[in-house]
Design a protein with these regions (language model features):
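Conserved N-terminal Rossmann-fold NAD(P)-binding element of oxidoreductases
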Residues: 172-176
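Conserved NAD(P)H cofactor-binding loop of Rossmann-fold oxidoreductase domains
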Residues: 25-33, 75
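Short alpha-helical segments and helix-capping/turn motifs at coil-helix boundaries
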Residues: 9-13, 53-57, 183
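N-terminal Rossmann NAD(P)H-binding glycine-rich loop of SDR-like oxidoreductase domains
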Residues: 177-186
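A short, well-structured beta->alpha microelement
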Residues: 1-21, 32
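A short, charged/proline- and glycine-enriched loop
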Residues: 19-20, 165-170
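Glycine-rich nucleotide cofactor-binding loops and adjacent beta-alpha elements
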Residues: 36-159, 169, 189-190
Length: 191
């Protein structure tokens, strides 16, 4: 059984939402990036709350032990190609979804950020859902192409090639009062 999330989650009317559900699709509304909308939206946007309520409802219904596919669909939440115009709404839901993915290993959570909703987009989403091994959690669809977020190996230069602090400069450390921030501050002070 597939369940497509709408505003009924916000309103709490999800009685039919139980452990027979095997696939959940959560779609973040698109077309909300106008300046006037942005000004008001911080007080009224319920998308992240809606996703939180969805996860809470699934856990209350003891679905956290079930193998469930959860797909989050956003609209241009990230600049993938370097020249995308973005709509930041949905990026908070993606962040929350990636956290839930780490916490509840039975759920295969996949985030899919698209520039347009077309038949090609739907086909790409279905293909990813069908063939994905779950190795990646974030996909983007731009101009008919699928992009996959992945970590790349990089070489770290040896210490001798890193430019040292300038003895006469002023260093401002923002945040990080413990851990790395404290060590950096102590190192700077020693110099």
């Amino acid at each position: 059984i597939e369940y497509i999330c709408t505003d009924d989650i916000i309103n709490g009317s999800t009685e039919e939402f139980d452990s027979t559900v095997r696939r959940v699709i959560f779609v973040v509304p698109e077309g909300r990036s106008s300046l006037s909308y942005l000004a008001e939206s911080y007080k009224t946007d319920k998308t992240a709350v809606s996703f939180f309520r969805l996860v809470k409802k699934m856990i209350e219904n003891e679905m956290d032990g079930c193998d469930i596919s959860v797909m989050i669909v956003t609209h241009s939440a990230f600049n993938v190609t370097g020249c995308d115009s973005i709509d930041p709404f949905g990026s908070d839901v993606i962040g929350m979804a990636l956290s839930v993915r780490k916490e509840i290993s039975n759920w295969q959570i996949t985030c899919f950020d698209t520039d347009t909703f077309t038949e090609d987009t739907v086909r790409a989403m279905e293909a990813i859902n069908r063939y994905s091994s779950g190795a990646s959690a974030l996909y983007a669809f731009r101009n008919g192409e699928v992009y996959i977020r992945k970590l790349e190996k990089t070489d770290v230069p040896d210490k001798s090639s890193i430019a040292p602090f300038n003895e006469e400069s002023v260093v401002l450390i923002i945040g990080g009062g413990s851990g790395i921030g404290a060590l950096t501050a102590a190192n700077s002070d020693d110099r």
